[in-house]
């Protein structure tokens, strides 16, 4: 049991092995997510394509591509990503800008968040999250002393402001919230002064609240969250249907594949509200199992970050912390939205929800975390065997 609370058990070995707790939790979440995507999408896939298993195999292909890409990323030294950080940031901003250009960006449900690349769609906001974390990790290493000055503190804030503005123009308010919270966490762990941190948190929180207050549809989401049953057939529809799914699941669920809510009652059943369908089919026990897997995953990520910090691998530490904050926060928000304790944000559940960009990028994020662990515990092996 003590091995679960440590990352040092395999340091003396000659063969590099990944953190099995982290890898096991990630694989379990992906596997369970794949099964639930197939179950939750049966009705909509049959209606749209005449093939009930369409999204099951589509998501399986994305996961396969994600795993292949992740393996390639895992084989590359962290120093490469550290040097490439500024270029990746510019690429991310450029992709976000392209989504706003008519004829290039693809509009769905009033939001222009995708780029059409032949038969597939790329969601730049997912790449922007990853690229921002990589860039900030390198910045905190290069400017470790300057971060404690107002100038060094404000520079990454300005970078975030550019990305945040482009995301708001899509609009993608949920991605802005996740990026802002990740920025706050990384700056705080990177040694920023407490008063700088508190001031940014207050100003950022006030700005996000103002955006919600002066945006009619965001305000409608907030009011419907506070009392979804006041308008269960309009503004509160998604949340009430999700709550019905949770109620039907009871302790052990209605059985895999037996959800009623996925039959066109619950919108986005295979993406944003996958967890509600899971709760209906697998019950409270299944819901708690998912939460437990995420807790194990994030805990191990933070342990890896702490081990890298103690080993003097600062970039790896910041990278692990940043990726952990991002994935953990997005999972927390999605689960909270599904359970009705947070307003609707339109964020997918990492490692589980359907979506090509989200699945592949999250697999890459896991690979980077495992790379941090590898270079921390097996520095000689990493230098010798990985180029």
Swiss-Prot record:
Q: Where in the cell is it found?
A: Cell inner membrane
Q: What is its main location?
A: membrane
Q: State the membrane topology.
A: Multi-pass membrane protein
Which reactions appear under catalytic activity for this entry? [GlcNAc-(1->4)-Mur2Ac(oyl-L-Ala-gamma-D-Glu-L-Lys-D-Ala-D-Ala)](n)-di-trans,octa-cis-undecaprenyl diphosphate + beta-D-GlcNAc-(1->4)-Mur2Ac(oyl-L-Ala-gamma-D-Glu-L-Lys-D-Ala-D-Ala)-di-trans,octa-cis-undecaprenyl diphosphate = [GlcNAc-(1->4)-Mur2Ac(oyl-L-Ala-gamma-D-Glu-L-Lys-D-Ala-D-Ala)](n+1)-di-trans,octa-cis-undecaprenyl diphosphate + di-trans,octa-cis-undecaprenyl diphosphate + H(+)
Q: Which domain of life is it from?
A: Bacteria
Gene Ontology MF annotations: lipid-linked peptidoglycan transporter activity; peptidoglycan glycosyltransferase activity
The record's keywords, sorted A to Z, are: Cell cycle, Cell division, Cell inner membrane, Cell membrane, Cell shape, Cell wall biogenesis/degradation, Glycosyltransferase, Membrane, Peptidoglycan synthesis, Transferase, Transmembrane, Transmembrane helix
The Gene Ontology CC terms held by the record are: cell division site; plasma membrane
Keyword presence, Cytoplasm: no
UniProt GO BP? cell wall organization; FtsZ-dependent cytokinesis; peptidoglycan biosynthetic process; regulation of cell shape
Q: Quote the function comment for this protein.
A: Peptidoglycan polymerase that is essential for cell division.
Tell me if Cell membrane is a UniProt keyword of this record: yes
Give, as in the UniProt entry, the pathway in which the protein acts.
Answer: Cell wall biogenesis; peptidoglycan biosynthesis
Q: What is this protein called?
A: Probable peptidoglycan glycosyltransferase FtsW
Report the top EC class in one word: transferase
Similarity comment: Belongs to the SEDS family. FtsW subfamily.
What EC number(s) does this enzyme carry? 2.4.99.28
Question: InterPro entries from the xrefs?
Answer: Cell_cycle_FtsW-rel_CS, FtsW, FtsW/RodA
Write out the transmembrane intervals: 20-40, 61-81, 86-106, 149-169, 172-192, 194-214, 284-304, 322-342, 349-369
């Amino acid at each position: 049991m003590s091995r679960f609370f440590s990352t040092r058990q395999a340091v003396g070995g000659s063969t590099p092995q990944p953190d099995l707790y982290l890898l096991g939790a990630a694989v379990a979440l992906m596997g369970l997510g794949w099964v639930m995507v197939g179950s939750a999408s049966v009705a909509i896939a049959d209606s749209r394509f005449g093939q009930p298993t369409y999204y099951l195999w589509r998501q399986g292909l994305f996961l396969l591509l994600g795993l292949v890409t992740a393996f390639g990323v895992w084989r590359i030294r962290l120093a490469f990503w550290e040097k490439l950080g500024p270029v990746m940031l510019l690429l991310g901003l450029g992709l976000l800008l392209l989504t706003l250009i008519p004829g290039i960006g693809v509009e769905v449900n009033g939001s222009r968040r995708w780029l059409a690349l032949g038969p597939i769609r790329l969601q730049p906001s997912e790449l922007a999250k990853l690229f921002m974390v990589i860039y900030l990790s390198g910045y905190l290493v290069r400017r470790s002393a300057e971060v404690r000055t107002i100038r060094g503190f404000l520079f990454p804030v300005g970078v975030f402001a550019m990305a945040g503005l482009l995301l708001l123009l899509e609009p993608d308010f949920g991605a802005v919230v996740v990026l802002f919270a990740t920025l706050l966490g990384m700056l705080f762990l990177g040694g920023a002064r407490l008063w700088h941190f508190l001031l940014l948190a207050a100003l950022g929180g006030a700005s996000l609240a103002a955006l919600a207050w002066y945006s009619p549809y965001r305000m409608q989401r907030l009011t419907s969250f506070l009392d979804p049953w006041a308008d269960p057939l309009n503004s509160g529809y998604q949340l009430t249907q999700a709550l019905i799914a949770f109620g039907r699941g009871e302790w052990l669920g209605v059985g895999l594949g037996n959800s009623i809510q996925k039959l066109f009652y619950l919108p986005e059943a295979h993406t944003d509200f996958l967890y509600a369908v899971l709760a209906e089919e697998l019950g409270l026990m299944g819901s708690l199992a998912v939460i437990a897997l995420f807790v194990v995953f994030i805990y191990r990520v933070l342990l890896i970050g702490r081990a890298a910090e103690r080993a003097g691998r600062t970039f790896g530490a910041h990278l692990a912390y940043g990726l952990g904050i991002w994935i953990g926060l997005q999972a927390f928000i999605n689960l909270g939205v599904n359970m009705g304790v947070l307003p609707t944000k339109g964020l997918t559940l990492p490692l589980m929800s359907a979506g090509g960009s989200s699945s592949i990028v999250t697999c890459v994020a896991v690979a980077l975390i495992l790379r941090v662990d590898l270079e921390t515990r097996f520095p000689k092996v990493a230098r010798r065997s990985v180029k």
